[in-house]
């Protein structure tokens, strides 16, 4: 399919406002922590076409909290202080120790999507067909190999998404295109036990999962179209076809509208969630991948890696109002809960750029600490999870 990559295979530094987090998708909050947003899987192995214009120094000033950025190049994730845009540490994920040699590891993992629930980070490890679970409370900047639990799922997991109530993680698995013994589908993980409770067959090569605000319906993007499943029964209730080469999905905050990217046509389909009909088609850039929607639902952001740009869409008018140039194959997006900052992962620049959405100016430029992917063992950001602690009175 066009635009897809087939894969064969102690606490953080003291910060009074960093705490555990809750469900994904900026829907739920637990205890004193709040999720800002969680992005899905980026594109591992994307081709490099340009250098990133780096800032001499970061001018970032964002919400107090942490960003966790998964990457498929170095096979780990970076923990970032969102208030300063400084990388605290970059950690390994899914790399198992070689028996008898405590200093050597099998570097076979390839991390894609990331999700957060109940103080745990969940990583889709495409290279090992596992979901890696790491407690944020266990992260220690002096140790880049944090303790983790590996949950075996279907082959080639691409995306992880947490239900609004935080009780389940749904895993989109592309699977081999021809293998009846390991079909593509969705694995459901209980966050209480961190065990797989179900495997749900859906259309071929599922790429992303999203939920209605109530959590009643799961939307799974596949090569065959958009599958709708009732989460209570884990049974399909419909499929929306005719979406071209779909990849990314977001749901409007009120649940009334679905947005799905078509990577081949360079468009976004606008779908009425009640009637399941496509009401508009919006042309954006080349290979539209991930999206993010503002908290009020009025603005949609679309990452176009093959155009080195982000399209900004007025959802009331269903049209692109302007385009922001971002070099380095931008394909991963995450918005802060107030919508004031857009975090953009650049898969071939080993950078995350932070935009002020009011002015579309760069307020932070974060070097993930390694070379670009083209120089070998480099960083390729594929997912961003932003978490923060509410301020007093919020």
Language-model regions, residue ranges each:
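N-terminal export and membrane-targeting signals
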Residues: 4-26
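Predominantly soluble domains enriched in secretory-pathway, periplasmic, or organellar proteins
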Residues: 15-16, 29-394
């Amino acid at each position: 399919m066009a635009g897809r990559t087939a894969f064969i295979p102690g606490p953080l530094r003291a910060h009074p406002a960093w705490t555990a987090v809750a469900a994904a998708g900026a829907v739920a909050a637990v205890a004193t922590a709040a999720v800002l947003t969680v992005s899905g899987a980026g594109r591992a192995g994307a081709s490099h076409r340009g250098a990133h214009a780096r800032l001499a120094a970061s001018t970032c000033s964002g919400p107090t909290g942490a960003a966790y950025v998964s990457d498929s190049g170095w096979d780990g994730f970076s923990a970032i202080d969102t208030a300063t845009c400084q990388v605290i540490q970059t950690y390994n994920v899914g790399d198992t120790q070689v028996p008898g040699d405590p200093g050597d590891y099998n570097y076979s993992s390839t991390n894609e999507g990331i999700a957060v629930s109940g103080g745990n980070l969940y990583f889709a490890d495409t290279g090992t067909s596992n979901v890696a679970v790491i407690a944020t409370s266990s992260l220690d900047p002096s140790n880049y190999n944090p303790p983790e639990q590996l949950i075996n799922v279907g082959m080639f997991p691409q995306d992880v998404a947490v239900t609004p109530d935080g009780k389940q993680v749904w895993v989109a698995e592309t699977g081999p295109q021809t293998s009846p013994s390991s079909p593509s589908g969705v694995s459901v993980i209980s966050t209480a036990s961190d065990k797989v409770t179900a495997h749900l067959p859906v259309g071929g090569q599922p790429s992303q999962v999203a939920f209605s605000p109530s959590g009643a319906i799961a939307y799974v993007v596949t090569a065959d179209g958009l599958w709708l499943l009732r989460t209570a029964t884990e049974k399909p209730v419909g499929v929306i076809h005719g979406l071209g080469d779909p990849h990314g999905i977001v749901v409007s905050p009120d649940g009334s509208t679905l947005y799905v990217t078509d990577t081949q046509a360079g468009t976004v389909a606008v779908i009425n969630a009640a009637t399941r009909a496509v009401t508009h088609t919006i042309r954006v850039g080349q290979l539209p991948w991930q999206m993010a929607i503002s908290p009020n639902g009025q603005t949609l952001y679309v990452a176009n890696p093959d155009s080195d740009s982000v399209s900004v869409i007025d959802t009331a008018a269903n049209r692109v109002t302007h385009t922001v140039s971002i070099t380095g194959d931008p394909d991963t997006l995450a918005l802060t809960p107030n919508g004031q900052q857009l975090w953009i992962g650049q898969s071939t620049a080993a950078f995350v750029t932070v935009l002020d959405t009011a002015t579309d100016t760069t307020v932070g430029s974060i070097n993930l600490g390694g070379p670009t992917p083209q120089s070998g063992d480099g960083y390729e950001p594929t997912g961003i999870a932003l978490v923060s602690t509410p301020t007093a009175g919020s």
